[in-house]
Regions:
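Aromatic- and acidic-residue-enriched carbohydrate-binding clefts of CAZyme catalytic domains
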Residues: 265-290, 317-344, 373-400
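Bacterial Sec-dependent N-terminal signal peptides
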Residues: 1-23
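Active-site-adjacent "subsite" loops/lids of carbohydrate-active enzymes
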Residues: 219, 226, 233-237, 303-360, ...
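An acidic-aromatic substrate-binding cleft motif
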Residues: 209-250, 254-258, 266-267
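Glycine-rich, aromatic-flanked loop segments that form ligand/cofactor-binding clefts
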Residues: 198-216, 258-263, 285-334, 416-420, ...
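N-terminal accessory beta-strand-rich subdomains and adjacent acidic, glycine-rich linkers
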Residues: 22-209, 215, 562-570, 574
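Active-site-proximal substrate-binding groove within the catalytic cores of carbohydrate-active enzymes
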Residues: 180-184, 402-602
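Active-site groove signature of glycoside hydrolases
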Residues: 255-265, 350-384
Length: 602
């Protein structure tokens, strides 16, 4: 395979002087700032430009490695003394030829192509999405995948159509928020233009991001793939030991293996918000003996996880005064302070909380929430204090250290501990600390659940991907209960219905699908995963193992292709119709599959 390596190393001042007279006719980024490295000539895109408004004493090194239909851009920055890193941008374009859609890890981002108007349309950081983007056509083929190795610090992306000439413009912006002084920084950008199935390039780019950073995923055990019950949607903060045990008896009979006790166990206040978080002691009126309560649930054959909002210390907690001066900011909507993990005593406090709970109550794991609230709102408070008391200057690094300390301490006590994180803190860095990634909250929204699960499956490797908690009205039809379950079937399903209240016909649907999900778990959750047409909301999703092919259909009038092979084939129908058109080679036929049900074609 043809391979070319171009390496250029010039100081920012030299490069700026050298290119000061260049007008770069036809280049849309000629006036975007000072050019701090020579233009990189790419085989996959047009010229790659690196600019900075104020490079100061920082010197830039840029290199480009081409390997057929993939390229890696490497950028290094060095300063003679420690200084806040210079902001810089990387620009490139390519013709809009066959490009109709766009994908990013942002669950709120559609697949449409935005105009290139200089507005950030995709951001990422350690606990917020991933710097991973793809342009693709209308036939599930990749046109260009872009990935960045910088998964800790914030990266802003401006991606879209430049009106003049109808070109795809891509701009990645680095160091756009407060950053601790440093002497060396580096990043890599992967470009992949292979015309492969769109999700293949996403999956491989995600693996590359982990590999280039040397990340190893948190161990995943079989318990992470078992169906579970969550208290959140039905109870909210109105939880107590007796009610949870009652629900768990029903859940265990249905086949659920784990329960997550969500918010409310630590307070008698029912006003939502987080004013009473921070002390993390069970409310005695609700949970008079937490250890005995957990033991009772264990006796049912279920594991027990407890929710914590990691960074929040409520204004009405005893802990709030203890950590005065050690907050990133105060959240006046949620009535709490957000801890600054750059203080070693803050990290120790949080680690001790979870370690003690694991030991004292014999828990099986945790739902660690709101990691994405570790951020700045305005200026970094450490700057005016000259980082006093902080043993880590960079916030992202501190969050990284905190979560490593938490996960290591818990694994030392219980090697098979379960730790759940919520979308949008996802990706290779977060996979180091947890083994369950849940789709972000979308109560009652089956389509969003399906789409969020699909996105997580592409970027989570072997980590167990969970649905957002399933709920439905007790008057719902059995068919639509089945459709809700099929929309989440390619993730571990979390249920959050009030089990004591649902009618028998809904129980029957749940039991039927739990049996199917258990019997086909390897294929549904661990085998090759192919979600078709993200621009249409994934109307067809396939999972295939060595022995079977499972195809879920979510759209009326869809035609699904079934290859001629000896594998077992199952059709799952969430389309709203009672028939599916199946094509095998040149022949088509209509197969009767009841809405909300499944059928074997063998």
């Amino acid at each position: 395979m043809y391979k070319r390596i171009l390496t250029i190393a010039l100081s920012a001042l030299t490069v700026c002087a050298s290119y000061a007279q260049s007008t770069w006719m036809g280049n849309p980024f000629a006036s975007k700032g000072k050019i701090v490295a020579p233009v990189l000539e790419s085989f996959l895109v047009d010229e790659i430009v690196i600019v900075s408004d104020n490079p100061g004493d920082w010197k830039f090194t840029a290199s480009l490695e081409n390997d057929g239909e993939k390229e890696i851009i490497s950028i290094s920055m060095d300063a003679p003394t420690e200084a806040p890193p210079a902001k810089f941008n990387v620009y490139f374009t390519f013709p809009q030829k066959g490009v109709f859609n766009f994908w990013s890890s942002d669950l709120h981002c559609g697949t449409h192509l935005d105009p290139f108007w200089g507005l950030t349309n995709a951001s990422s950081s350690l606990a917020y999405r991933m710097p991973l983007y793809e342009y693709f056509d209308d036939n599930n083929r990749n046109c260009l995948t872009i990935a960045c190795s910088e998964v800790l610090r914030k990266v802003d992306a401006v991606l879209g159509i430049m009106e003049e000439g109808c070109a795809i413009c891509s701009e990645l912006r680095f160091f756009r928020e407060s950053e601790a002084p440093a002497k060396h920084c580096e990043t890599k950008i992967l470009l992949d233009k292979r015309p492969v199935f769109w999700s293949e390039s996403i999956r491989e780019a995600s693996d590359w991001m982990a590999q280039v950073n040397g990340y190893e995923a948190f161990p995943v055990n079989d318990s992470a793939f078992e169906p579970l019950y969550s208290s959140w949607y039905q109870f909210h903060q109105d939880v107590n030991a007796e009610a949870i045990e009652q629900e768990c008896r029903i859940a265990a009979d249905l086949g659920m293996k784990t329960v997550i006790l969500d918010d409310g166990w630590q307070t008698t206040d029912g006003n939502r918000g987080y004013a009473f978080c921070g002390d993390w002691k069970p409310a005695p009126q609700k949970f008079p003996d937490m250890a005995a309560h957990v033991a009772a649930v264990h006796d049912l054959g279920m594991k027990y996880l407890v929710w914590y909002s990691v960074p929040y210390v409520g204004w009405h907690s005893d802990a709030y005064k203890k950590f005065e001066g050690k907050y990133l900011y105060n959240d006046h909507v949620s009535s709490c302070g957000v801890l600054d993990p750059r203080f070693p005593e803050v990290r120790k406090h949080l680690v001790d909380l979870y370690v003690n709970a694991l030991k004292d109550w014999n828990l099986d794991g945790f739902k660690l929430d709101f990691i994405d609230s570790f951020k700045f709102r305005g200026e970094d408070p450490a700057v005016k204090e000259n980082y006093a008391g902080r043993d880590i200057m960079n916030l992202s690094e501190a969050v990284n250290v905190l979560m490593k300390e938490v996960s290591s301490a818990l694994r030392a006590i219980k090697p098979d501990v379960l730790i759940e994180f919520r979308q949008q803190y996802i990706g290779p860095a977060i996979r180091q600390y947890g083994n369950m990634f849940r789709a972000a909250d979308c109560p009652g929204n089956a389509k969003d659940n399906r789409m969020r699960i699909a996105s997580l499956r592409l970027t989570s490797g072997s980590t167990a991907v969970h649905s957002d908690m399933l709920e439905w009205n007790i008057s719902e039809t059995p068919e639509n209960v089945g459709r809700a379950i099929i929309n989440s079937i390619f993730g571990v399903i979390q249920y959050s219905t009030m089990l004591r209240n649902i009618p028998q016909e809904q129980f029957d649907v749940m039991r039927k699908w739990m049996k199917f999900a258990s019997e086909h778990r390897e294929t549904l959750l661990k085998s090759e995963f192919r979600p078709h047409h993200p621009e249409l909301g994934y109307p067809v999703i396939e999972a295939e193992s060595d022995t079977e092919l499972i195809i879920a259909v979510y759209q009326d009038n869809a035609v699904i292709d079934v290859p001629r092979r000896g594998k077992s084939v199952y059709i799952l129908n969430a389309s709203g119709s009672d028939s599916i058109v199946v094509r095998c080679g040149s022949k088509t036929r209509t197969v009767k599959v009841p809405c909300g049900d499944w059928k074997s074609l063998n």
